[in-house]
Amino acid sequence: MNKDKFHVIIVGGSIAGLTLAHCLHRAGISHVVLEKASEPAPQIGASVGILPNGARVLDQLQLYETIEKYIEPLETATIGYPDGFSFSSSYPKLVNERFGFPIAFLDRQKLLEILYQHYPDKSKIRLAARVISIESSAIDSEVTTEDGTIYKGHLIVGADGVHSRVRSEMWKAAQRIKPGLVTKREQRSMTVEYSCIFGISAPIKGLIVGEQVNAFFDHLTIVTIHGKNGRVYWFLIQKLDRKYIYPECPRFTAKEIGPIASDLKEVKFFKDITFGQLWDSRETASMTVLEENVFDTWYHGRMVLMGDSVHKMTPNIGQGANMAIEDAAVLSSLLSDLLQKQTQPPTNAQIERLLAQYREVRYPRVNSIYKTSRFLVRFQARDGIFNTLFGRYYAPHAGDLPADMASKTIAGGELISWMAYM
């Protein structure tokens, strides 16, 4: 069938949604993006790591060349401990040599700006379009936004983040058909044990461009990445007082961040450089809890999830955005392949088989990387006697272990199957 007769509604215009829009545009598949924010690239103080597996897909989409202008490849990482011991690792450089792309960070806002500005038809990206309900029938679905506009499509993609409206609507639809299809256990499977203050700071003397600092304290981790022109991207991760079940977890206002940060200003994370210097030179900063989970239910009917809406990791592993980019590559590849074979719009059964295949391809890889993420956040926060001793007395003498761990998550990354890759 004509691919432009099959219409995809993407809910969420962040990295996941905009990457999928680029993929669908290249495939000639009709689509629209509904983004609740009134601007395409808001500054929320966040950075984003582009690892080789995500970079390869962005390179296929001819976006990576632009991204390269705003990144500084990492070459060295320094790891420090509370007793003053530290060691350096060239694992970022080794990863670059192995995969042909570096580990690099840039402003999340800048990546969104690139994705938006390089998308050829801005009329397909609807801003200030907050979704309030989704209804599905045997042949299509309807999405209603806050202003009363109704969008009709054949597939609804939830690229709307950890607080996904599409996930909620999908669960409600599943419960109407068969109560218990999405179990209470799954609905309460996302947990929170850590908080994160994250920000971007002006250059600080002593923090060298192209280097990363990881400072491991008891139940506290400080990570800094020194990017283009010395711009410092940083995370301060702390263990909370207890384990919370989402959505019943702490929320932090802008007024609360200052006092929390002030209590940590004297903490030295690299030589004599303190967290206070990071904080005082900040351009922007925010605070959030770190949700963790991979949901079992990825799709129902004509609704499907991708990115943080279905798998949420901590930033320690740097794979969150890259997993969303891979999701876009796989989903668009499967859709393109199906529609090329069709003379009529796909039936519900065909859509269900496609979405089952999408989950079958993605779940094992995502779950494996998620487990590594869970380990890393606890390892770096010296959470428990094993992590404390392993981190201090084994890891510094383990040679290429950091590079091997990073390489394991990067290897096997997905590509857009119908696009050439050199």
Swiss-Prot record:
Disulfide bonds: none
Pathway it works in: Secondary metabolite biosynthesis
InterPro entries: FAD-bd (IPR002938), FAD/NAD-bd_sf (IPR036188), FAD_mOase_fung (IPR050562)
Gene Ontology annotations for the cellular component aspect, listed alphabetically: membrane
Location(s) in or outside the cell: Membrane
Sorted UniProt keywords: FAD, Flavoprotein, Membrane, Monooxygenase, Oxidoreductase, Transmembrane, Transmembrane helix
Enzyme Commission code(s) on record: 1.-.-.-
GO-annotated molecular function: FAD binding; monooxygenase activity
Gene3D superfamilies in the record: FAD/NAD(P)-binding domain (3.50.50.60)
Annotated membrane topology: Single-pass membrane protein
Main localization category: membrane
Alphabetical list of PANTHER family matching this protein: FAD-BINDING DOMAIN-CONTAINING PROTEIN-RELATED, FAD-DEPENDENT MONOOXYGENASE ASQG-RELATED
Role this protein plays: FAD-dependent monooxygenase; part of the gene cluster that mediates the biosynthesis of the indole diterpenes penitrems. The geranylgeranyl diphosphate (GGPP) synthase ptmG catalyzes the first step in penitrem biosynthesis via conversion of farnesyl pyrophosphate and isopentyl pyrophosphate into geranylgeranyl pyrophosphate (GGPP). Condensation of indole-3-glycerol phosphate with GGPP by the prenyl transferase ptmC then forms 3-geranylgeranylindole (3-GGI).
Protein name listed in UniProt: FAD-dependent monooxygenase ptmM
The species this protein was found in: Penicillium ochrochloron
Lineage: Eukaryota, Fungi, Dikarya, Ascomycota, Pezizomycotina
UniProt gene name: ptmM
